[in-house]
């Protein structure tokens, strides 16, 4: 039974969103895979999740409470330390799953022993006909950005296949435990954003493959956790875009990125926020740049 149905540890974070987490847990009750555990890792919420998340209602669920907010990277790394599974399903609490999700995500691992990570098709919860993610294009070493394949397209079955992809999506990914043991966990220096791409780069450089499984689906309540657009998001996206390039681009490639960012990104972003009167965003943008001068690019994994 263990070989036929390896244990899958579902790891999700909660931060002052007990109701959202409950909706996620309710959706997990429809899973048809027979061998899984759920770990809810609370990031020092001011509201007590124990008041609403009951082991009686969710008997295969364990709740762990951190004394500090460890962020996406640290929180998931912390959750992995408690997980007993052969595979870890790292998934946002602002998602809802479909019943055969795990079975479908395991297929690429069975097809190719070099599989490291498998991601499902991610669709918008608010409009379930629209795709949010169907894979990532390769990171552009000049801009420090990647393109999301299929984003905002109507789902007409055009991505209903298994295919290799450059990047894993942080909202939902199935990872083999032995890959984490060999490559390491998320780089905690990032806290939020770009950590899964840094991790993706290490996994690919180690010779493993990342697959998109278009027959598996997760519905994502886009950015409930930090908001669709706010200064905190602007800060971490800016800071970590530069940090990612510092860690993964060297020599002439890093010089090309620096030139592009200085001559194009900075003036364009500055003008955009000034014209729109969004000065808190502008301050966050420049703080993200400035902090790269004072932090090391090294991050334990």
Annotate each PLM feature.
Residues 88:
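Short aromatic/hydrophobic "clamp" motif used to bind/position activated sugar donors
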Residues 47-48, 95-108:
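Acidic donor-binding/catalytic loop of UDP-sugar-dependent glycosyltransferases
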Residues 74, 78, 103-184, 189:
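Acidic/His-rich active-site region of diverse nucleotide-sugar glycosyltransferases
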Residues 181, 185-191, 197-219:
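Catalytic donor-sugar/metal-binding loop of nucleotide-sugar-dependent glycosyltransferases
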Residues 65-83, 93-95:
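Glycine-rich, basic loop-to-helix element that forms the pyrophosphate-binding segment
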Residues 26-35:
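Short, acidic, metal-binding catalytic loop of nucleotide-sugar glycosyltransferases
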Residues 232-240, 251-301:
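Non-catalytic, C-terminal membrane-associated alpha-helical segments of glycosyltransferases
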Residues 36-44, 64-66:
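Short beta-strand/loop segment that forms part of the nucleotide-sugar
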């Amino acid at each position: 039974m263990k070989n036929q149905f390896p244990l899958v540890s579902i790891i999700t974070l909660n931060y002052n969103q007990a109701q959202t987490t409950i909706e996620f847990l309710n959706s997990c009750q429809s899973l048809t895979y027979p061998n899984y555990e759920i770990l809810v890792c609370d990031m020092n919420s001011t509201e007590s999740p124990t008041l609403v998340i009951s082991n009686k209602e969710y008997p295969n669920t364990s709740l762990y409470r951190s004394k500090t907010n460890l962020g996406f990277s640290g929180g998931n790394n912390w959750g992995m330390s408690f997980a007993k599974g052969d595979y870890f399903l790292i998934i946002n609490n602002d998602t809802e799953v479909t019943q055969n999700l795990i079975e479908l995500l395991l297929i690429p691992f069975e097809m190719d022993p070099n599989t490291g990570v498998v991601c499902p098709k991610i669709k918008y919860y608010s409009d379930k006909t629209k795709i949010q993610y169907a894979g990532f294009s390769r990171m552009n070493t000049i801009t420090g950005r990647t393109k999301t394949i299929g984003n905002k397209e109507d789902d007409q079955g055009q991505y209903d296949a298994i295919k290799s992809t450059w990047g894993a999506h942080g909202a939902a990914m199935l990872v083999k435990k032995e890959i984490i043991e060999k490559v390491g966990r998320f780089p905690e220096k990032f806290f939020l954003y770009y950590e899964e791409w840094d991790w993706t780069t290490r996994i690919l450089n180690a010779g493993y493959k990342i697959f998109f499984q278009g027959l598996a689906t997760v519905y994502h309540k886009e950015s409930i956790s930090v908001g669709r657009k706010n200064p905190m998001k602007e800060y971490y996206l800016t800071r970590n875009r530069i940090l990612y390039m510092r860690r993964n681009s060297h020599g002439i490639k890093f010089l090309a990125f620096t030139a592009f960012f200085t001559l194009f990104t900075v003036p364009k972003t500055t003008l955009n926020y000034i014209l729109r009167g969004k000065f808190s965003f502008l301050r966050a943008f420049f703080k993200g740049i400035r902090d790269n001068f004072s932090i090391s690019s090294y991050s334990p994994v």
